[in-house]
Amino acid sequence: MDQIGVKPYTVCLAKFRFLESEQFKVRPVIVAGHPYGTRQVVAVIPISSSAGAESIDVVLQNWQAAGLLKASVARVHRISATLLKDLLEEIGSIDKIDQAAIKAALKELLIL
């Protein structure tokens, strides 16, 4: 994916690699920062349509506009880093209401 197209609150499909294998699965994520460093590391928040969210996770109110196929949850408690090259395709963006909820959750999680 072209770095120019990656900005916070973009929803992308990303490769999630298994720790002890070359295998991966493709999952939607919310870009939570700008690419950083020589390896172009990007903070991402995984998205899931599965029930069982933690209290800090955010139920996306406008999931369809974000390019998602099902009602979904931003798994804020599982924020992680991936390489820019593992972002495969932009599928949408998070609206202002959901952005505010995610920002509040990140502030609580990271004690900012």
Stretches found by the model and what they are:
Residues 63-112:
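C-terminal terminal-subdomain/extension
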Residues 20-26, 31-64:
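Compact nucleic-acid interaction/catalytic patches
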